[in-house]
Amino acid sequence: LSGAFDLLTELERHAPQALPLVASEMVRIAQQVGQLGRAREVLQRSYTGHPSVDIADALVQADVADGMPLRDAREGYVRHMAVEPSLIAASRWLSQEPFAQDGAHAVVQRSVEEAVRPLARYRCAACGFEAQGYFWQCPGCQAWDSFPPRRIEEL
């Protein structure tokens, strides 16, 4: 796993635009190989240059893995929304926010998640095909490298 982590950190130099695609996995592997601090540094540098909800999410994940209470770590979503307005970040922040009316939380959260779902997809620049995951080759038109490595919300 150490080799996998090293390869993922090389994306910062060779393909920084692709780092959001693997940010969460980088944190997971970093935690297993004891490199959480290094992963956080790489992600923070990338985020500073190219703010992304996926990197913000991975930074929150890294903070929690490093022992920060989720209540404090999720402030990363608020900081992201201050830089880049994001319904995806708002949804993730809201999912852990206590409501005065317990019964309302599930209904509101489900509504927000449904509204956010289309924004969290990736879209082929050639044909407009949308997918929940990133593809090197579009399943719709078969074009290669036609998916920008950013979610629809961030385009």
Per-segment meaning from a language model:
Residues P16-Q17, P51, P85:
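Helix-capping and short linker residues that terminate individual alpha-solenoid repeat units
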Residues L1-E12, Q35-G49, M68-V83, D102-A115:
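Alpha-helical repeat scaffolds
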Residues L21-E25, A58-L59, L87-L94:
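"A position-specific structural signal for the A-helix of alpha-solenoid helical repeats
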